[in-house]
Amino acid sequence: MGQQSSVRRLKRSVPCESNEANEANEANKTMPETPTGDSDPQPAPKKMKTSESSTILVVRYRRNVKRTSPEELLNDHARENRINPDQMEEEEFIEITTERPKK
């Protein structure tokens, strides 16, 4: 059998300069500097006062309409291209509204 070489690892009391540079780079990656040059986090913005009025959310979507013939389908596409969706009949759409309760 051949000779086995033993490797001794000594701990350094002072870290290597390249390690210090790597640690500094890692710190910069995790905490970016602010425009003023410091890395302190900014305080959270204050909450704005809510208005007294209710919020209304309107969601409009077209219902699926059954068509029996290709001619009806072609006529419907031509109609959709001519008419603005806001001008279509109300019964073709479902409207959902929500209101925020007053506090």
Curated annotation (Swiss-Prot):
Alphabetical GO biological process terms: spermatid development
GO cellular component, one term: nucleus
Motif Nuclear localization signal, chain ranges: 43-51
Residue stretches of biased makeup (Basic and acidic residues): 68-83
Coiled-coil segments on the chain, per record: none
Segments for region (Disordered): 1-103
Cellular compartments annotated: Cytoplasm; Nucleus
Family: Belongs to the SPAN-X family.
Protein name: Sperm protein associated with the nucleus on the X chromosome B1
Species name: Homo sapiens (Human)
Gene name as annotated: SPANXB1
